[in-house]
Amino acid sequence: MPQHDQLHRYLFENFAVRGELVTVSETLQQILDNHNYPQPVKTVLAELLVATSLLTATLKFAGDITVQLQGDGPLSLAVINGNNQQQMRGVARVQGDIPDNADLKTLVGNGYLVITITPEEGERYQGVVGLEGDTLAACLEDYFLRSEQLPTRLFIRTGDVDGKPAAGGMLLQVMPAQNAQAEDFDHLAMLTETIKSEELLTLPANDVLWRLYHEEEVTLYDPQNVEFKCTCSRERCAGALKTLPDEEVDSILAEEGEIDMHCDYCGNHYLFNAMDIAEIRNNASPADPQVH
């Protein structure tokens, strides 16, 4: 059995092409545990999680990537946020009924894919592409074609392992400033496309690479762990409250007695009473009662 929740990078010795392989199980489960999503939405979040992990691994700097689907369908929003340390979180918003056999276009409707790259230092970049492909992988390949100009292929698989949801994926990309032959890249993509869900989700990474590329010379690097981690905090909530008009905050306090800030990603609640709000307005740091 493979070690899930790990990302592996690999290089082809004889081609200017690099690859990534990721499998997720526990990270996915933690994202899904906080909500009661229909199965098709769980599948979309699993695919988004895999895609975001693969994309963050392409970053050459410290920062994060947010990959989100938005549309006018019953799945109005699905988003995964991850950073270069492979710390992930995600959430979806569902409006209306979703049939069990709903595909991506049925779920999202008329929509688009938004990819936001936020370096810790430097300018933020955002790319938007319409959902013209039938799969998330196809839409992401369209994004790469339009933005990076680097030939890129993604292969995403979802399923169950020991009764728990799992997902995996592989990314192939021509190395920047390298002259990879188109036929070489296409050859490697054809090999990678043969990967089955069962193989990707149940075999160790080196076995997967052997099955796909046993006639090629491939270097597999040490893996990087993938984990669920939310970036919410009481301080961030206090900062958000500080931006609201005093009248609006006071009205909620008068009606409710306290303000309950809820994080959609992890389910944490942060409670603020009148004394906390007074401290926030005085630029003090309020006490830290946090409800899970």
From Swiss-Prot:
- Here the disulfide bonds are C230-C232, C263-C266
The main place the protein resides is cytoplasm
Which CDD domains would you find in this protein's record? Hsp33 (cd00498)
The Gene Ontology terms for molecular function here are:
protein folding chaperone; unfolded protein binding
Keywords, ordered alphabetically: Chaperone, Cytoplasm, Disulfide bond, Redox-active center, Zinc
GO CC, sorted alphabetically, is: cytoplasm
Q: What residues form the membrane-spanning segments?
A: none
The entry sums up its family as follows: Belongs to the HSP33 family.
The record describes the protein's role as:
Redox regulated molecular chaperone. Protects both thermally unfolding and oxidatively damaged proteins from irreversible aggregation. Plays an important role in the bacterial defense system toward oxidative stress.
User: What's the protein name?
Assistant: 33 kDa chaperonin
Provide the species name.
Salmonella typhimurium (strain LT2 / SGSC1412 / ATCC 700720)
